[in-house]
UniProtKB/Swiss-Prot annotation:
GO molecular function, one term: AMP binding
Positions that bind ATP: 388-390, 412-417, 501, 516
Protein known as: Acetyl-coenzyme A synthetase
Pfam family, one: AMP-binding
PROSITE patterns to which the protein is assigned, alphabetical: AMP_BINDING
Originating gene: acsA
Entry coiled-coil feature ranges: none
Length: 651
């Protein structure tokens, strides 16, 4: 990939200064960058002091055996104590920790004092089932408070949890149970999704059968649906946990004690079990949650819309917010049940002040229309966040304008399952924000963009995003496979962490993420990022969402093929397709014009909302469509395939 190839095609000139009152009272000011630059390890040692340690660490970082980092290694702490007990001891036991909103409209509030009792009871129940320090527990749950309680109960007794998203198949669950050697599974009869109960227990029964190692299955009753039952193995949560003592004294564990394993899909073969440990992970998740959202725990109401099954839910529903003593909303269901204004109804009901959601959701809201959020009082919101993939500038502007009253900062956060916590993001009280850019590494984080030879690219240049210094919440290894850890993340550039993202620096040196490197297309010798072409398409008033892939082309090497979802009532026509093609040409340059544009009703997405471009590539190249098991709706691909041959092409 040549330097100029990813040069900044898209010029974004809009800037948004921080609101004056927020900047004046911000938790983190511009000085933090200078302080961290002057003494990076001292900076992280200071952030670690925001936690409560049983034994304070004297050593910040041991990097004697790279790439295996040890942070705060002589310190000891209990993660659950930090997330629950210490707030009760500080006199905040009556503060609401979780406002739970069920999809069907049921709700309950859990205070920190109640959460402490529930976590203690669950910890005692796990001990009774024979779970010991160092064991692994698999969790396959809907979005209900018991999911967070189960995770914290594991942390409390020193057992590592492996949460598997409730949308995954029994096969996926079985391989994860086997890989982690989990002897206990915590699940529910089901959860509510799109207005009806969605069963979870049958997948667990199949997975447990296949794995052959599970001794106990603990089942929360959520929906009341019928479940198959094995008396020798299955236990109801309410019968096992509710009767336990609410007294449990948490033990302090080493800072490097395993906290959880979270599986992420590998490009090849079996999923990778990403291992996170205790002290460094909690230090960085707590700090970033407090800094990036400017959290004031006494007054803010935080809502992260992710599922706990993803890293965003681990770091910014369970660990970061609770370590900071925040009050937050947890919502079980989908954004359009029972109506398309459900998210805004929830913001209004709880007075949500900080909202953290994904670009895929924002683009969906755009498609549904501006009039829906306009019906609700969203004036409580003061900071908006985005996570999961690069956000198109137009979606960013829509989010700020329609959800944030054209006044709230939008923090576009880049990080990964592997990084554990936010890495590159604006700060709401400091940064003059640019729509579509994550901008700069947080204080204490070292990231840059390099070319093929690992040389840092100049401003205006593009290449690969790398992390050049260890960070507290970094993955420690791939569970059971140190060699794969080295090969996957540390082999491409000597001494640098690289996880597959392309990026560019603009003329100010700010970082723009360009999606996965395999989402970079080579058209007539020019590298063109799918993210930029998608952003150009979405900036057209008729387009709600776009997915772009490169398809092999005899003439140009790769041809750009775009799949677009039109807004609201827009009718598809050949004229519109030509207009969109010209719009991309005018926005990015003629080289970036898609060869084919196909209006579709839906795009293939994983259950976490990421677009599965590889499947679209299969369609665009007339191949048999590959593995669709992680798709939220596998019928989408059939619809797209039947339509493609008729789509006009620009020859």
């Amino acid at each position: 990939m040549s330097n100029e190839s990813l040069a900044n095609l898209l010029k974004e000139e809009r800037r948004f200064a921080p609101p004056a009152d927020l900047a004046a009272n911000a938790n983190v000011t511009a000085e933090a960058y200078e302080q961290a630059k002057a003494d990076r390890l001292g900076f992280w040692a200071e952030q670690a002091r925001r936690l409560t340690w049983a034994k304070e660490p004297t050593e910040t970082l041991d990097w004697s055996n790279p790439p295996f980092a040890k942070w705060f290694k002589d310190g000891t702490l209990n993660v659950a104590y930090n997330c629950v007990d210490r707030h009760v001891e500080a006199g905040n036991g009556d503060r609401v920790a979780i406002h739970f909103e069920g999809e069907s409209g049921d709700s309950r509030a859990l205070t920190y004092a109640q959460l402490k009792d529930e976590v203690s009871k669950a910890a005692n129940a796990l001990l009774e089932l024979g779970v010991q320090k160092g064991d692994r527990v698999a969790i396959y749950m809907p979005m209900i408070p018991e999911t967070a309680i189960a995770m914290l109960a594991c942390a409390r007794i020193g057992a590592a949890h492996s949460v598997v998203f409730g949308g995954f198949s029994s096969d996926a669950l079985a391989t994860r149970i086997q890989d982690a050697d989990a002897r206990v599974v915590i699940t529910a009869d089901g959860g509510y999704r799109r207005g009806k109960p969605s069963a979870l227990k049958p997948a667990v029964d199949e997975a447990v059968e296949r794995a052959g190692i599970v001794e106990h299955v603990l089942v929360v009753r959520r929906t009341g649906q019928d479940v198959a039952w094995d008396d020798s193995r299955d236990k109801w949560w309410h019968e096992t946990v509710d009767g336990q003592s609410a007294e449990h004294t948490p033990e302090a564990f080493d800072a490097e004690h395993p906290l959880f394993i979270l599986y992420t899909s590998g490009t090849t073969g079996k999923p990778k079990g990403i291992l996170h440990t205790s002290g460094g992970y909690l230090t960085q998740t707590a700090y970033t949650h407090w800094a990036v959202f400017d959290l004031k725990p006494e007054t803010d109401v935080f809502w992260c819309t992710a599922d706990v099954g993803w890293v965003t839910g681990h770091s910014y529903i369970v660990y970061g917010p609770l370590a900071n003593g925040a009050t937050q909303v947890m919502y079980e269901g989908t954004p359009d049940t029972p109506h398309q204004g459900r998210f805004w109804e929830i913001v209004q009901k709880y007075g949500v002040t900080i909202l953290y959601t994904a670009p895929t959701a924002i683009r969906t809201f755009m498609k549904w229309g501006d009039d829906i959020p306009a019906k609700f009082d969203l004036s409580s919101l003061r900071v908006l966040g985005s996570v999961g993939e690069p956000i198109n500038p137009e979606a960013w502007i829509w989010y700020r304008k329609n959800i944030g009253a054209d006044a709230t900062p939008v923090v576009d956060t880049w990080w990964q399952t592997e990084t554990g916590a936010m890495m590159i993001t604006p700060l709401p009280g400091v940064t003059h924000a640019k729509p579509g850019s994550a901008q700069r590494p947080l204080p204490g984080i070292s990231a840059t963009v390099v070319d093929d030879e690992a040389n840092e690219v100049p401003n205006g240049g593009g290449g690969y995003l790398v992390l050049t210094e260890p960070w507290p919440s970094m993955l420690r290894t791939i569970w059971g496979d140190d060699q794969r850890f080295i090969d996957t993340y540390w082999s491409r550039f000597e001494g640098k962490y690289f996880a597959g993202d392309g990026a560019k620096k603009d003329d100010d040196g700010d970082i723009w993420l360009l999606g996965r490197v395999d989402d970079v297309m080579l058209v007539s010798g020019h590298n063109i990022s799918t993210t930029e072409v998608e952003s150009a398409l979405v900036s057209h008033p008729s387009v709600a969402e776009a997915a772009v892939v490169g398809a092999t082309d005899e003439t140009t090497g790769q041809a750009i093929v775009a799949f677009v979802i039109l807004r609201g009532t827009t009718a598809e026509s050949e004229d519109l397709v030509a207009e969109l093609r010209n719009h991309v040409g005018a926005t990015l340059g003629p080289i970036a014009k898609p060869k084919r544009i196909l209006p579709v009703s839906e795009l293939p997405k994983t259950r976490s909302g990421k677009i599965m471009r590889r499947l679209l590539r299969d369609v665009a190249e007339n191949r048999q469509v590959g593995d669709v098991t992680t798709l939220a709706d596998s019928t989408v691909m059939d619809l797209i395939q039947t339509k493609l041959p008729a789509a006009p092409s620009e020859d």
